């Protein structure tokens, strides 16, 4: 059982800094301001949001290529709670393949046995996980004691689980809600992608590119790219995002491209695709993550 390939699947379908500040925004004051689009955080109530997620990691080392792919289905519910929202997410199905061959993993059993719960503020800010120890309890039901169980226990440790959940939520949604967004407007967050025994760090730049009609309604379109350094003449908002994240060392030469669609009106993570490429310790890594909302279903009573 290896936790690594499933890192991005745990969290909140909904994957950035480990702090709770909103991501800074920037738009040139000298440019004419186009019509704005407002995103309010209005989750669907009494509905189950089903998403499919896919993460593909490939690494070239010593002339060989290893490819791992994770596919999973998440089901998410939102309930009003204490002036905010309780998010509850289950992972009823997950699948890992390595070089095209399915690999049995006890991690899938753990994910299927507990529901991840997070408390969000009224404006969509991530506050904390609720009862994160449920993950380790599920692990004890699945994994026998031993060295590998110890690795998984650390992976599902409440503090580590909350850090990953917070980062994944914020890298996708921090700074987008309760604000008027205009085309060309940019925001920045620091993201980390685990690769082997190391990680890739970069500043993710999100640029508002307008709106698009989708089967799930109108959505705001965000173009995604990453920066491997903070330029000397960087906007204050970009520098602030890096400082807020603790001034991490960014991975030289990292590149990425992608797109994210967030529904207008009620909260709907329509889709997201991001491909990250980096060379770490002489190994060439490519990590692609994709998520797509399949729709809402009325919750059974």
How would you describe each model-predicted region?
Residues 1-9:
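Bacterial N-terminal signal peptides that target proteins for export
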Residues 17-18:
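C-terminal motif of bacterial Sec signal peptides marking the signal peptidase cleavage site
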Residues 23-301:
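Signature of exported/secreted
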């Amino acid at each position: 059982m290896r936790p690594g390939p499933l890192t991005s699947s745990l969290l909140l379908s909904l994957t950035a800094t480990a702090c709770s500040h909103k991501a800074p925004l920037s738009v040139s004051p000298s440019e004419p301001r186009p019509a704005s689009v407002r995103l309010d955080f209005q989750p669907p109530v009494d509905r189950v949001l089903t998403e499919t997620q896919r993460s593909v990691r490939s690494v070239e080392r010593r002339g060989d290529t290893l490819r791992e792919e994770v596919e999973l289905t998440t089901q998410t519910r939102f309930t009003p709670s204490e002036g905010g929202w309780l998010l509850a997410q289950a992972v009823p199905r997950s699948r890992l393949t390595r070089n095209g061959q399915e690999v049995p993993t006890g991690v899938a059993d753990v994910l299927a046995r507990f529901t991840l719960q997070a408390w969000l503020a009224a404006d969509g800010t991530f506050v904390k996980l609720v009862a994160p120890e449920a993950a380790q309890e599920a692990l004890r039901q699945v994994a026998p004691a031993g060295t590998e169980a110890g690795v998984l226990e650390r992976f599902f440790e409440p503090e580590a689980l909350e850090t990953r959940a917070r980062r994944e939520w914020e890298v996708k949604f921090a700074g987008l809600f309760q604000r008027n967004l205009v085309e060309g407007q940019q925001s920045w967050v620091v993201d980390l992608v685990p690769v082997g025994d190391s990680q890739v760090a970069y500043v993710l730049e999100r640029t508002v590119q307008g709106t698009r009609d989708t089967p799930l309604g109108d959505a705001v379109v965000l173009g995604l790219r990453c920066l491997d350094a903070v330029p000397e003449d960087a906007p204050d908002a970009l520098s602030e995002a890096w400082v807020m994240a603790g001034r991490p060392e960014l991975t030289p030469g990292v590149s990425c491209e992608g797109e994210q669609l967030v529904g207008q009106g009620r909260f709907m993570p329509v889709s997201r695709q991001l491909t990250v490429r980096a060379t770490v310790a002489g190994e060439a890594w490519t990590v692609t993550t994709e998520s797509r909302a399949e729709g809402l279903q009325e919750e059974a009573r």
